[in-house]
C-alpha cells in the first residue's frame, strides 16, 4: 500500500479526482492513530493533546483513493474562535464533498461511549446521505462492560454490520477497515 501526504487544507480542498474515505470523531478519539494503523505507516501526526489536527489532511492511497483526516469535534485546547473556525470548515467540507465521500468512519471511544456530538454527526451523515461505519476505538483501554455498553449505544443508531471494534495500538479491526476502504 502506497500512501502519499497531499497536504493540509483550510479553504480549498484538492480536486475531487478520487473517492474519499474520511475519519471523523471527537478530539483525541484516535483518528490519526487509526489512519496510521490502517495504512501500516505513520503518515498522520499523532498527539496526546486534543485538537492537534487543525486542518483537513489529505492522503492519496495507491493513486486511487483519498484518505481524509479531519479535526476532531468537542474538547480541544483551543479558544472558542478557533473551534468555530473548525466547525465552519467541517460543515463546508461535508457540504462540498458529500457526493465524493465513499465512506465516513465515525470513531467513538469505547470508554466514553456515544456523546451528543456523535449523535449529531450520525444525523448529519444521514441527512447528507453519506455512508458511514461506526468504529469503536481504544478497545484495548476499555473493560468488557464498557465495550458492551458502547456497543449497545451504537446499535441504537446503526445495525451490527456498520460497526467495527478497533485498537490502533494492537492493530485490531485493521482487516475489517481495509475491506471497507478498498471495496
From Swiss-Prot:
Segments forming domain EngB-type G: 17-183
GO biological processes: division septum assembly
Required cofactor(s): Mg(2+)
Domain of life where this protein originates: Bacteria
Residues engaged in binding Mg(2+): 32, 53
Signal sequence, renumbered to the chain: none
InterPro entries tied to this protein: G_ENGB_dom, GTP-bd, GTP-bd_ribosome_bio_YsxC, P-loop_NTPase, Small_GTP-bd
NCBIfam families the record matches: GTPase_YsxC (TIGR03598), small_GTP (TIGR00231)
Similarity comment: Belongs to the TRAFAC class TrmE-Era-EngA-EngB-Septin-like GTPase superfamily. EngB GTPase family.
Protein name: Probable GTP-binding protein EngB
Gene it is expressed from: engB
Amino acid at each position: 500500500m502506497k500512501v502519499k501526504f497531499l497536504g493540509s487544507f483550510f479553504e480549498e480542498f484538492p480536486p475531487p479526482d478520487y473517492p474519499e474515505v474520511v475519519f471523523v470523531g471527537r478530539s483525541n478519539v484516535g483518528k490519526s492513530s487509526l489512519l496510521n494503523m490502517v495504512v501500516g505507516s505513520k503518515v498522520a501526526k499523532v498527539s496526546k493533546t486534543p485538537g492537534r489536527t487543525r486542518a483537513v489532511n489529505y492522503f492519496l492511497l495507491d493513486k486511487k483513493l483519498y484518505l481524509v483526516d479531519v479535526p476532531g469535534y468537542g474538547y480541544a485546547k483551543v479558544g472558542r474562535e478557533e473551534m468555530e473556525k473548525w466547525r465552519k470548515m467541517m460543515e463546508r467540507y461535508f457540504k462540498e464533498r458529500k457526493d465524493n465521500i465513499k465512506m465516513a468512519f465515525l470513531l467513538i471511544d469505547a470508554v466514553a461511549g456515544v456523546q451528543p456530538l456523535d449523535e449529531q454527526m450520525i444525523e448529519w451523515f444521514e441527512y447528507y446521505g453519506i455512508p458511514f461505519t461506526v468504529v469503536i476505538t481504544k478497545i484495548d483501554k476499555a473493560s468488557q462492560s464498557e465495550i458492551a455498553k458502547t456497543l449497545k449505544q451504537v446499535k441504537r443508531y446503526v445495525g451490527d454490520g456498520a460497526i467495527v471494534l478497533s485498537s490502533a495500538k494492537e492493530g485490531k479491526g485493521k482487516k475489517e477497515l481495509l475491506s471497507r476502504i478498498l471495496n
